[in-house]
């Protein structure tokens, strides 16, 4: 038997090879959908279309909120142009511990541990910390990932055992 510990190696951060974005025609985008604006993944909060002018296509004006920073971004593009739409994934993790501002999380399905996410430096982070310290049930945090970024964007207490 060799001393190689191949089963100790974990490659959880590897990219599946799937694209982080996909193209979608500007005129097909809708409010509450996601879109990339200035290289950031955003949720569309407002859209308006201007009529076709004598110099070309109808224009679509979008107002969107960055899903990670909550900053408001705007873009105007011809309705026939393609825009990048980020692939946004949401997962729930069980909060096991909060250590030095980082969350120790466990996937409730696979039991895999995740220790690389910072507790948000906002009111949301304080709410999660308070719920965890009250110990009234399991705290589940919602982790959103897009374009290689991840952040905790929500939480709830699960009282079922």
Curated annotation (Swiss-Prot):
A GO CC term attached to the entry: cytoplasm
Annotated keywords: Cytoplasm, Elongation factor, Hypusine, Protein biosynthesis, RNA-binding
Keyword Lipoprotein: no
Cellular location(s): Cytoplasm
GO-annotated biological processes: gamete generation; gonad morphogenesis; nematode larval development; nematode male tail tip morphogenesis; positive regulation of translational elongation; positive regulation of translational termination; translational elongation
A Pfam family: eIF-5a
Entry's family note: Belongs to the eIF-5A family.
Protein name as annotated: Eukaryotic translation initiation factor 5A-2
Gene for this chain: iff-2
């Amino acid at each position: 038997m060799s001393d190689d510990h191949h089963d100790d190696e974990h490659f959880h951060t590897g990219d599946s090879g799937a694209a982080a974005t996909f193209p979608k025609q500007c005129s097909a985008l809708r409010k509450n959908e996601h879109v990339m604006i200035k290289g950031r993944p955003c949720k569309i909060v407002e859209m308006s279309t201007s009529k076709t002018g004598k110099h070309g296509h109808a224009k679509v004006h979008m107002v969107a909120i960055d899903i990670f920073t909550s900053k408001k971004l705007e873009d105007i593009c011809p309705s026939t142009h393609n825009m990048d739409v980020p692939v946004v994934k949401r997962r729930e993790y069980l909060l096991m511990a909060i250590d030095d501002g980082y969350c120790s999380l466990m996937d409730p399905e696979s039991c895999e541990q995740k220790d690389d996410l910072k507790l948000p430096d906002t009111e949301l982070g304080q709410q999660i910390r308070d719920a965890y310290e009250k110990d009234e049930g399991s705290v589940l945090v919602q982790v959103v990932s897009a374009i290689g970024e991840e952040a905790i964007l929500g939480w709830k207490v699960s009282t079922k055992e």
